[in-house]
Each structure stands twice: as C-alpha cells, then as structure tokens.
A protein has these predicted regions:
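Short, flexible loop/hinge motifs at secondary-structure junctions
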Residues: 1-173, 216, 245-246, 252, ...
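Catalytic center-proximal scaffold of phosphoryl-transfer enzymes
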Residues: 6, 90, 96, 114-116, ...
C-alpha cells in the first residue's frame, strides 16, 4: 500500500509540474497575442494611464503627480526632481508670417457710398490703409523655357565663320524637361513621399503633358548615379569623426524571377547628432553590412544592441554604446500588456528621471563639459536605483514574459547603457537615428518597393543627400541645382567639396527657409 501511495504522489507531483508549466506557457502566449493586437490596433503612445498611476499610490518613494507629469512629457523632458517648475508662458497670439516671403499687394477700394463725405457731400481722400496679411499660394506653374544661344560673326571677315554660345550644362543632355523639373520630381518622391505614378497623373492633369513613370524613373536613377560619389565622400566625413549613431530598416526590392515576389533588403543609416547622415543599401541584415561601412572606424558607435554591430565591426578602439530609449520602450510594452505591472511602471518612471537630467542640460544651454558635470552629479545614484530595481524584477517575473525580456535586455547591455558617464558627447538615446528612418517608413507606404537590386545604392545616395540637407537646414533644391549639372558634364575628382556639409560651409549666410 505504501508503495502505491508513493507512486501516486510521484505521479501527482509530476502532473502538478506539468500543469504549472502549462499555465506559464499560456500566460506567455496570451501576452504575445495581446502584444500583437496592441501593435496592430493599439495606440502608439508611451504615456501611462490613470489605472497604472493609481497602482503607484501604494508604491513607496513614488510620487504619483511626478510620474503623471513626466509620463505626459515623455522621455527627455525635465521632471520636478531635476528642474524647477516653469510657469506657462502667455499665448504669443497670432503667428507672424515670415519676412522672406514676397508680398503681393491687394488693394480693396471703398464702396462708392464711402467715397462721398456724409457731411458736405464732397469727395473723400485716401489717407492710408488698414493692412492685414494672409498666407496665399500659387499652384505650380509650368512653362516652356526657350534657350537661345547667341551666334556671332564678323560681317567683314566671313572666312572666320560663326561662333555660338556654349551649351548650358544639364543633368540629362537633350532631355525634354529642365533640371528644375528633374529635381522637383526627386524631391516630391523622396522628401514629400509622392510616388511617380501620382506625379505623372498630376502633370497630365495640370499641363496636358504625359510623361511616363518609366521616364521619370530614368531621371531618378540618373541623379542617383551622380550622387553615389557624393555619398561616398559623406561616408568619409562621417568616419573621420568620433561618434556615430546607427540603425537599419527593411525595404522591399522587386525581384525579376517571374514569381512576382519581393526580397526584403535593408537600408542601414549612419549619422551623427547635429550632422549629416549616410544610408547604405544591403540585400541582407547580416554583419557584413556594418562591417564594410564602418571599416576601421575609431570612436563611439551607438546602436540598439543588434548583434550585427558587434563582432568584427570597426577598428580596435571602437566603443560600443546603447540606447536608453530602446530599454525604456521594452518596459512600456510590458505595461501595455499588463496594465497592473507596477514594477515595469516604476522602471519607466526611473528612466524618465534619467532623461530629465539631459533635458535640464538642454534647457540651460550647457555645453558637453557642463552636461558631463551635471550627469556626474545626478546620474550615478539614479543608475544604482534603476539597476537594483530591475535586478529585483528579474527575480519575480517570468523570463519569457515582456517584463522578463525587458529586464534581461537592460541588464545584458548595462555597461553600454552607462557609457554616457564617461563620454559627454554621447546622447542617452539613438532617437536621432530613428528619426532619420521616418521618411523611409513614410515612403514605403507610397512607393511600395525599390525596383531592383541595382537601384538600391542609387536610392541610398539620394536618401543620404535629402535627409542630410533636412538635418543641416540646407535648401535641398538649391543644393542639387548647384552640384548636379557639374557632376553630369564634368565629373569632379574633388567630391569632398560637394557634400552637403562642405557646400553649406562655404555659404555661411545660407538661407534656412524654404528648405525643400
């Protein structure tokens, strides 16, 4: 009998373990399902809800009002713990229109009855105007440009022949359209995300001229070819610095294998805060992409901890750093899956205090030295608190749950997350790199895919120039109009002088209005 009881107890214990495992598995699967639904249907906000804030009322050392205010501001904004409360400024009133815009007078005359004095019956005199301004627009106006090259000859010396003015350098020789039309087409596609089929339809509607998408695509590819050497020079500029932020995003590339499928390629983005950004097209997300681009780079490389950026990338003195926004986002995702996850809410609140330190430095217009001193004063005790909290979390949450994965991710890259203590130029987040990816994300929903693998490097060069001009406040149309004809007709060896940064440096009074 005792043997039977022991066997039954052993079987019961085994079934209990199986049941516990099944429950944990169900919990993880439910969490993943909820995560998919949130990604598909839920809001993109990373703020905390009222219910989540109520849970913090019982949490020691957590002030609900501070969390509410900081959550609404988002990462990077100062919190009451790190900056004085600022009073809301009065509303500035109606926005004034920029002085650089031309003014066109529109005179509104008085009615005939107002032109006669009601007292004596005499004619009144204009003594001034009541002036108001509104922003107006003139739709794109197409016209035909007649280029007349002067021909000269000596009537006395007919044997000397005729001399004609030289041809004007153009992006595409003998093209039906001017350089301005080609540049406008490119900017509309890659800055305004208007696909070529839509531009072709608009052109036909407004002018009656039908230019096929294939012809427009040829213009784009020609410009891409011309800009590849410029993008290469931009890469050299970037590698000569000591700080690069990197990220990557997928793009579909049309295949021509007869199956009608697309291949998922990647645009890798490399940039520096306050400077240019360079895109590199690769057919895969493998390590060979950053290994080739960052060959022999010596400096700080800030990424999201994707493994492809690690082994064999850069020079021997490369310093790897990671992004606090990525770590924070994982805890925010955990809160979205479990709105009563007090531990994850607390982790988000602590990270917001960390971002508030740098926000205070920005508000006070501190240089790197000032920010470094502020970080050294306020960040170390806060980092100890964050790490201790996450270590305690990791002991109580399921390893495969969102909170467990957020904890594991943050602890695994902790050394890289805290590099900012030693390098004052290092930003807390990689958000600037992510922001440079937004035009591609917007464009994907409009132009769908890249036409071929050969087109990839050309598109990457175009994105490099367009996005760098945006980041550097350079009017991209003026820039392209200045460099493309010369590149097309007399390719220069000194392409380093044609990068957006170098071009703008020679124009210190360059207007930063009308950038596109």
């Amino acid at each position: 009998m005792a043997e039977v009881i022991a066997q039954l107890e052993k079987q019961l214990e085994s079934e209990r373990k199986e049941l516990a495992y099944a429950r944990l598995k169900i919990q993880v699967l439910e969490e993943r399902l909820r995560q998919q639904r949130i990604a598909q249907y839920g809001p993109g906000s990373e703020t905390l809800s009222n219910l989540q804030l109520e849970l913090l009322d019982e949490e020691p050392a957590v002030n609900r009002d501070e969390v509410q205010a900081q959550s609404e501001r988002g990462p990077g904004a100062p919190s009451p713990a790190t900056s004085e409360k600022k009073h809301r400024a009065p509303h500035p009133g109606r926005q004034s229109l920029p002085a650089h815009l031309p003014r066109v007078d529109k005179v509104v005359a008085c009615a005939p009855s107002q032109c006669v004095c009601t007292c004596c019956g005499g004619e009144t005199t204009v003594i001034g105007y009541e002036i108001s301004e509104v922003l107006d627009v003139k739709p794109a106006e197409y016209f035909v440009e007649l280029t007349k090259r002067e021909k000269r000859a000596c009537k006395k010396c007919e044997e000397q022949g005729v001399a004609a003015a030289p041809l004007t350098a153009r992006i595409i020789d003998k093209s039906l359209v001017s350089d301005r039309v080609i540049i406008d087409t490119l900017v509309r596609k890659y800055a305004d995300h208007c696909p070529l089929y839509r531009q072709s339809s608009i052109l036909k509607r407004d002018t009656g001229i039908e230019i096929s998408r294939g012809t427009m695509c040829g213009w784009i590819m020609r410009v891409g070819d011309l800009l590849i050497p410029v993008a290469s020079a931009m890469r050299s500029e970037l590698l000569a610095g000591n700080y690069i932020q990197a990220d990557e995003t997928p793009v579909d590339v049309q295949t021509h294998d007869g199956r009608g499928t697309n291949h998922q390629a990647y645009l890798w983005q490399y940039g520096t805060p306050g400077g240019a950004t360079v895109f590199n097209f690769r057919m895969s997300r493998g390590r060979e992409g950053p290994a080739h681009f960052l060959d022999r780079f010596e400096g700080i490389l800030q990424t999201d901890a994707y493994a492809a950026y690690d082994r064999g990338v850069g020079g021997v003195n490369i310093v790897h750093a990671c992004c606090w926004a990525h770590a924070r986002r994982r805890f925010v995702d955990a809160v979205k899956l479990n709105k009563r996850d007090v531990a994850s809410i607390r982790a988000v609140e602590l990270m917001d205090e960390l971002f508030a330190i740098d926000a205070q430095a920005r508000d006070d217009n501190m240089d790197h030295a000032g920010r470094h001193a502020l970080r050294q004063q306020k960040a170390p005790p806060l980092l100890d608190q964050i790490r201790g909290h996450i270590l305690e979390m990791s002991k109580t949450v399921l390893p495969k749950s969102a909170a467990g994965q957020a904890s594991s991710y943050t602890l695994a890259i902790w050394t890289r997350l805290t590099r900012f203590l030693d390098y004052p130029e290092l930003e807390l987040s990689n958000n600037l790199a992510e922001n440079s990816m937004r035009p591609i994300a917007l464009g994907r929903s409009n132009w769908i895919h890249i036409g071929s693998e050969d087109a990839g490097p050309r598109i990457a060069a175009i994105f490099s120039v367009v996005e760098s001009c945006r980041r550097l406040n350079i009017p991209v149309r003026d820039y392209l109009a200045a460099i493309l004809p010369g590149l097309a007709n007399a390719p220069l060896q000194r392409t380093a002088e044609l990068t957006p940064a170098a071009w703008a440096a020679r124009r210190p009074h360059l207007s930063t209005v009308g950038l596109l």
